[in-house]
Swiss-Prot record:
Pfam families: V-set. It comes from Homo sapiens (Human). GO terms for biological process: adaptive immune response; cell surface receptor signaling pathway. Alpha-beta TR is a heterodimer composed of an alpha and beta chain; disulfide-linked. The alpha-beta TR is associated with the transmembrane signaling CD3 coreceptor proteins to form the TR-CD3 (TcR or TCR). The assembly of alpha-beta TR heterodimers with CD3 occurs in the endoplasmic reticulum where a single alpha-beta TR heterodimer associates with one CD3D-CD3E heterodimer, one CD3G-CD3E heterodimer and one CD247 homodimer forming a stable octameric structure. CD3D-CD3E and CD3G-CD3E heterodimers preferentially associate with TR alpha and TR beta chains, respectively. Residues 22-114 form the Ig-like domain. Glycans are attached at N96. This is Probable non-functional T cell receptor beta variable 5-3. PANTHER family: T CELL RECEPTOR BETA VARIABLE 5-5-RELATED (PTHR23268:SF6), T-CELL RECEPTOR BETA CHAIN (PTHR23268). Probable non-functional open reading frame (ORF) of V region of the variable domain of T cell receptor (TR) beta chain. Non-functional ORF generally cannot participate in the synthesis of a productive T cell receptor (TR) chain due to altered V-(D)-J or switch recombination and/or splicing site (at mRNA level) and/or conserved amino acid change (protein level). Alpha-beta T cell receptors are antigen specific receptors which are essential to the immune response and are present on the cell surface of T lymphocytes. One of its GO terms (cellular component) is plasma membrane. Disulfide bonds join C42-C110. Residues 1-21 form the signal peptide.
Amino acid sequence: MGPGLLCWELLYLLGAGPVEAGVTQSPTHLIKTRGQQVTLRCSPISGHSSVSWYQQAPGQGPQFIFEYANELRRSEGNFPNRFSGRQFHDYCSEMNVSALELGDSALYLCARSL
């Protein structure tokens, strides 16, 4: 069995339901293989128009990916174009990562603000 068959991508999401942070993320855990695509969802509690996405790799602090406000991308960090997203009229947001790489294994967080 070659080493490529044993290489799995593990993507974690924090928050299985509404909490004080004011967001619901889904799915909460996800296992994908290299080269696949993934869609992560974030639903903020109503009244919060801005959603930010972060990646936290093992042993590191969170890194800013991008922020959406009122359905428009307001700012973005230094991530490749494989990371894309959008925000809907109800302020829910999706982040897509295409062509997964080993370095994408991380905890992914979304945060809301007014």
